[in-house]
């Protein structure tokens, strides 16, 4: 750790930070405000709320109030922005900015954290560039003294992007996007059930005037027939194509059609395509019963998803650090997420690229607009086009046979992965088989061929429709080899948890004895525990996280009513503390006990003492998470008994074991989208590998790189040979030896008011957006 960073606790002494939310609200803004306030106070700085956005900055007075630790309590689970946001005309005029500068100087505030969309952030940059002129004007007119001017000689600005459209270039995800997707998907799922009853076509209009992100991801997450987005207008004969597509879907036996339209959708000539236009077209040409639903402001509402709370919190921490480390020479920056890395980017570069996209669309340079949106957006578009617009070939000549299976415990999103694997496989012209009940089913021959409609409507369904078991293959190699020959299986896609990975290792071992096992296979990590080596995320973990989070919210609410109550909640995850840690961040827990971060009786004592102190404040409730296997002796009951005894007369304790609800439920948008893209990526790899492994008329794959885990690493999806991942695995505890999320634990402790050192050595350095374009998360 570098020495200048070591003093995070004193970094803010003598400094003041103001935080404001501006422009359209977005879920997760409160999480960011809470983190800015608490981390600011932790560093020794004074933190001020600016109410009503820039308007409050201009009007001053009671709009700018000092924040306390407790004033941001219970904010985490609220949607919108608690400190208010307003569109502000005054700040656009220099006169307004002069008043704003005066209000800041008088309070000694030289650090401004702006949470909003690109308009709000551009405004902040203008304000910063004029700062010294504004000060000299104020000094000339006698509004501020020379001494005040010197004290506030420069203004630091850091932006956080809060916008449900995800329309800001340079950030993979803006605060609020994931929550907006949650709202949309809840509605799409509800509409799907009624559409199926009546065989209807639904046209859904989602927000996004200049950006089609929400529409695009929604269509991937619900398997829509068609999506209209501003960046990619349809071809000139789109009416023909759309109607043909809808009737094909119907003829395959589907009872519903879903068409997603972004509010800014246009055709190649820039003429708007409205949801009514589409409805009229379908009714006129096909005579289908068609309904339009415009989602509107529902998308901005509701509680933030777990992802947005963690994103808001992490960005808030990073923003405070960027402000306090700022000098007159550092450009105004935005803090954002790339893959799962926090990055700082020059604010104006991002604004420029964001404007370039709009200009490219205005000038009908649509290919360029798509490129500027970044690689992740383009990947979404490619997968959508494949799944929605390519017809599977009629003949299976020269095709290969690939089998898909689920292994391990059920996880939400497994079905979405199976669906995209099967459909992409069919589009490539392969024969696709599905295996029921994991390796056991492969041994018993529970295998059948899957056609296009076999997996219809699977994206939104939780659990595992194929059936899944933890059984490993080793003891049934004889039968498995026989079935590989019998069904002519030439490639295997294994979707599952830690057993899918260890099963893969066993298959590699078995190749020495059984030639039949020399076929390419790929493991797609799918488990709520997120403990598969070689991947930062696994399918199903996001859904489980949201389930835990929702439960914790309800429990906290009940505790807020009874007061002086501490809840101890046990989460799943085996030995892996991912769920407990991330849910702790997202639900605002006081502590999260996990196996990877060993704790002693002294730590438990410190936690109890901490809660005793907390009961003296206005926040009279506590939330403690415990991973199921964090310690064999300090069980949930033990911790509950300890807290009950030590808290006598000060607080009551209650315990909850969440259990299997964490494996159930409908998959979240993230898990649907992630699973869909992983399935597509796995099949593209598979068809290449099978062709490579063709020897004398049969498949023979014997190299280490023909058995891989497909994982998300930092910013890209990568294939890693299972044998190479052995070194990185702790087999006894079924977890990877290195886990990226452990470095988020200090944030959890600081936000819960513990005096600890924040290791800021892993800080994001300023990057440039052009470089980022090529290295972006390739998901």
UniProtKB/Swiss-Prot annotation:
It is found in: Cytoplasm. GO terms for biological process: canonical glycolysis; fructose 1,6-bisphosphate metabolic process; fructose 6-phosphate metabolic process. It is an enzyme of class 2 (transferase). GlcNAcylation decreases enzyme activity. The modification Phosphoserine is found at residues 132, 376, 666, 774. CDD domains: Eukaryotic_PFK (cd00764). Glycans are attached at residue 529. The keyword rRNA-binding does not apply. The keyword ATP-binding applies. Substrate binds at residues 163-165, 200, 207-209, 263, 291, 297-300. Its cofactor is Mg(2+). Mg(2+) binds at residue 118. One of its GO terms (molecular function) is 6-phosphofructokinase activity. One of its GO terms (cellular component) is 6-phosphofructokinase complex. The modification N-acetylthreonine is found at residue 2. Beta-D-fructose 2,6-bisphosphate binds at residues 470, 527-531, 565, 572-574, 628, 654, 660-663, 734. ATP binds at residues 24, 87-88, 117-120. Allosterically activated by ADP, AMP, or fructose 2,6-bisphosphate, and allosterically inhibited by ATP or citrate. The active site is at 165 (proton acceptor). Residues 390-400 are annotated as: Interdomain linker. InterPro entries: 6-Pfructokinase_euk, ATP_PFK, PFK_vert-type, Phosphofructokinase_CS, Phosphofructokinase_dom, PKF_sf. Catalyzes the phosphorylation of D-fructose 6-phosphate to fructose 1,6-bisphosphate by ATP, the first committing step of glycolysis. Belongs to the phosphofructokinase type A (PFKA) family. ATP-dependent PFK group I subfamily. Eukaryotic two domain clade 'E' sub-subfamily. This is ATP-dependent 6-phosphofructokinase, muscle type. It comes from Bos taurus.
